[in-house]
Amino acid sequence: MSILVKNNIHWVGQRDWEVRDFHGTEYKTLRGSSYNSYLIREEKNVLIDTVDHKFSREFVQNLRSEIDLADIDYIIINHAEEDHAGALTELMAQIPDTPIYCTANAIDSINGHHHHPEWNFKVVKTGDTLDIGNGKQLIFVETPMLHWPDSMMTYMTGDAVLFSNDAFGQHYCDERLFNDEVDQTELFEQCQRYYANILTPFSRLVTPKITEILGFNLPVDMIATSHGVVWRDNPTQIVELYLKWTADYQEDRITIFYDTMSNNTRMMADAIAQGINEVDPNVAVKIFNVARSDKNEILTNVFRSKGVLVGTSTMNNVMMPKIAGLVEEMTGLRFRNKRASAFGSHGWSGGAVDRLSTRLQDAGFEMSLSLKAKWRPDLDALELCRQHGRDIARQWALAPLPETTQKTAPAEEITTCAAADLGPKMQCSVCQWIYDPALGEPLQDVAPGTPWSEVPDNFLCPECSLGKDVFDVLATEAK
């Protein structure tokens, strides 16, 4: 099945609704993906890219239903990765002499995957053209390291379509092909996820390359990507977003992620978040347990954030393995213009937080002071965590924050008001976790200042996951 893109250009790619892992298992494609291949029928017939190798046979069969394979004059390979050029072996078995236009680096990659050095390769570089008849040409633009050394884009004159390779794409599967036809929230979420997890390391290359392409002074009516939608409605909107994302991007957002063995580090994360919110309620704070969260969502939030707090328990004197792996991935992504702080709990010796701080600094983050707690944090330790959050909120503020002021009411009056307004603290009889009405439980949408009587009946203890019926009034407050 083909889809008309524009005039004599048809999409002949493959949708992949089921794929959930990309680049091994490093990228979770939660909304599937597509492998976009395009067939151009002018005086010359041109195929731009193929599909993932697992769809090779199906792709060639479908292509044969669109055109006699022998009538394909040229094959353009913008990128040699297997999700772009994976069907070449199956296709070239049918038309072995058809010329393949690609960069010099692509020949090495294609031969490395397919092992056919005898194929009819034609090397192109930036500014080279290929006449396809009817007054139209293909213009080639090398885009090395966006995101492989072999990458290039292809521009078609007359129709003003830019075949952009991986740039401006997204792992997003939909029966509809064009950007104006799909759910806009989903689309732009996947665009940002794609950029944050794949193209961030090459941000410094993106702006010069876009500037170079714009320097050709060629109109762009459509951007036909290798994955996801074709941008036909205001295609420059995604270009403008890329230029924004390349500029050491950050929002007024803080990401907290952690791993924990006994919930001690989780308690610290909650308290730090409370402190941040207390001082700067306008900053967005997102908390993730790495063992229970989508790694790529965490990394996308780091990309969006002005700073990140990373927590780990100590295990054999080092950080938890999932934290170590995620920090290593952040090192490779080379985030810029971001601050960081390490925190965590330990038992007898510690070591993980210091190691984590060093790794975050090596990853290019501007470091703030770290925070450690021994064993399970008590009320005093949790207050230190909240104070750490308050300090972080002030240090990382994008604009000066108003000084917090407290009313100087007598201590007896404050105590009386608190008791009268909020009621007693409650303690879980199973794990001893304490609910403080003054603090609430933000992770369950229980706001600070919520008395126990107003806590929803479906409330669960954050540590042992049991319900309200196992809670008793804290012994020190029982009358």
UniProtKB/Swiss-Prot annotation:
Domain Rubredoxin-like: 423-474
Keyword annotations from UniProtKB, A to Z: Cytoplasm, Electron transport, Flavoprotein, FMN, Iron, Metal-binding, Oxidoreductase, Transport
Annotated PROSITE patterns: FLAVODOXIN_LIKE (PS50902), RUBREDOXIN_LIKE (PS50903)
Domain of life: Bacteria
Region Zinc metallo-hydrolase, residue ranges: 30-210
One GO molecular-function entry: electron transfer activity
Pfam families hit by this protein: Flavodoxin_1, ODP, Rubredoxin
Pathway(s) per entry: Nitrogen metabolism; nitric oxide reduction
Localisation per UniProt entry: Cytoplasm
Co-factor: note: Binds 3 Fe cations per monomer. Binds 1 FMN per monomer.
InterPro entries in alphabetical order: Anaer_NO_rdtase_flvorubredoxin (IPR023957), Flavodoxin/NO_synth (IPR008254), Flavoprotein-like_sf (IPR029039), Metallo-B-lactamas (IPR001279), ODP_dom (IPR045761), RibonucZ/Hydroxyglut_hydro (IPR036866), Rubredoxin-like_dom (IPR024934), Rubredoxin-O_OxRdtase (IPR016440)
Cofactor: Fe cation; FMN
Positions annotated to bind Fe cation 1: 79, 81, 147, 166
Residues annotated as binding FMN: 260-264, 342-369
Binding-site residues, Fe cation 3: 428, 431, 461, 464
Binding site for Fe cation 2: 83, 166, 227
Domain Flavodoxin-like: residue ranges: 254-393
GO CC annotation: cytoplasm
Role this protein plays: Anaerobic nitric oxide reductase; uses NADH to detoxify nitric oxide (NO), protecting several 4Fe-4S NO-sensitive enzymes. Has at least 2 reductase partners, only one of which (NorW, flavorubredoxin reductase) has been identified. NO probably binds to the di-iron center; electrons enter from the NorW at rubredoxin and are transferred sequentially to the FMN center and the di-iron center. Also able to function as an aerobic oxygen reductase.
Complexes and interactors: Homotetramer.
Family affiliation: In the N-terminal section; belongs to the zinc metallo-hydrolase group 3 family.
Name of this chain's protein: Anaerobic nitric oxide reductase flavorubredoxin
Organism, as annotated: Salmonella paratyphi A (strain ATCC 9150 / SARB42)
